[in-house]
Amino acid sequence: MTIEFLRSELKRIIIALTASGFDRVNSGTVEKLDKIAAVAEMIGMKEGKRLIGNLSNTMKAIQERKSGAASGTVRLMALDFYVEKLAGDEDMEEL
């Protein structure tokens, strides 16, 4: 997997969560985040792994009613910022 592939997968998840909200999170989304976090770790994206893991853990807590949407929103925004920064870094390399 390339960074671009990870970025596009994360962006899809971010868009889906933004559209549907955290109340409709399914286990498949959480599992996908966990797999993406593992790949991020393998390719040395420590901050990406941390942010993805934070969102995944928060989503699990929301499913278990141990956390609320506000907590998920903060993690989602942090991950979205990171993903956009990855896109910006790639654009700079092309110049």
Residue ranges of predicted features:
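Amphipathic, coiled-coil-like alpha-helical segments
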Residues: M1-A16, M42, K46, N54, ...
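Alpha-solenoid HEAT/Armadillo repeat architecture
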Residues: A19-F22, A38-E41, K60
